[in-house]
């Protein structure tokens, strides 16, 4: 039972952490709320980093919790602090500088970190970029202002968003993707083909099945060598080859971890006094029919709200259709469900022409996901039907070949 004398501690100052803190207060919790974040910035949303922030948006873009809001809500923040130990028996966390805090309930919202490319160690470090934090974005933005050519290693969502932003700034961009198509882990081939065409129409070169074998300094820039003998030179390289969940703390204190911190539908870990939410968690999704680890803004926020409510004693469960979005050039993409599970595709409108929706079906003909192009209303309808289990009238959709 939460009391005015209890303490709820949140480790991680991103989307999930900020929403845990805000939800605790909106639900009426009066005890101590302490949020500990590794970054010195106040909590902020990450989606703008690859888009509006690179294009010049101010430092307050995507702010989740300002100093004024934290003061008004009586939320205590330790910023620029890294938690190095969780003592479950004593119910206490310890930071790298020696500070510690006791907790009644603990929330792990530690997020994820970019997967590093070992080959990058051979290249000039001032020319290599990853994108996860506001500091990363500021450094990349500065580099793009003085660059003519950018290499993007990885044709996933982050890589393509950065490619689009850099292209808008007048930078010549080449994307090197190891797979046979872009975003192959998350969408069907029809969507990949559209994405590739969109970027080509704006002058972005995409090389598929491109295996990078070396990165080396060339003059004041660097070059990437491929296994087919081709070489691509650039001023800077952005590496976007996925992320890894930050589960080190959870592992070190003995929590169940399996491709993320294992949580139940309410965000509880294997310790009933510790909850987790966001990119670092693994939960069962009825829409996938299995345990999944989701990397999205919406999942981080939704899980955080449920975890905070559950810690206060509410009988709640996180059960939402996965949803992500991406802005590239003048196109807004919205994705619901698990389109990568599709074996068949239906369309409404003309998504390949820039406005419409692909509806993804599995082998049994069930809807498993959707991808909308400049059609948010269409996507909302599909999400609502998937969430409720209501049937979707497929008579208004046109059938395409297998996904």
Residue ranges and their predicted role:
Residues 1-9, 65-151, 225-227, 236-240, ...:
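FAD-binding core/adjacent interface of flavoenzyme oxidoreductases
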Residues 140, 391-403:
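Cysteine/selenocysteine-centered motifs that mediate thiol-based redox chemistry or coordinate metal-sulfur cofactors
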Residues 124-147, 220-225, 231-306:
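FAD-site-proximal beta/loop scaffold in flavoenzymes
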Residues 12-15, 38, 132-133, 153-158:
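Glycine-rich Rossmann-fold phosphate-binding loop(s) that bind the pyrophosphate
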Residues 79-90, 208-220:
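A conserved short coil-to-beta-strand element within the FAD-binding core of flavoproteins
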Residues 2-7, 26, 280-376:
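Mid-to-C-terminal Rossmann-like scaffold of FAD/NAD(P)H-dependent oxidoreductases
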Residues 2-76, 165-186, 381:
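Beta1-alpha1 glycine-rich phosphate/pyrophosphate-binding loop at the start
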Residues 50, 149, 158-214, 296-299, ...:
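Rossmann-like dinucleotide-binding cores of NAD(P)H-dependent redox enzymes
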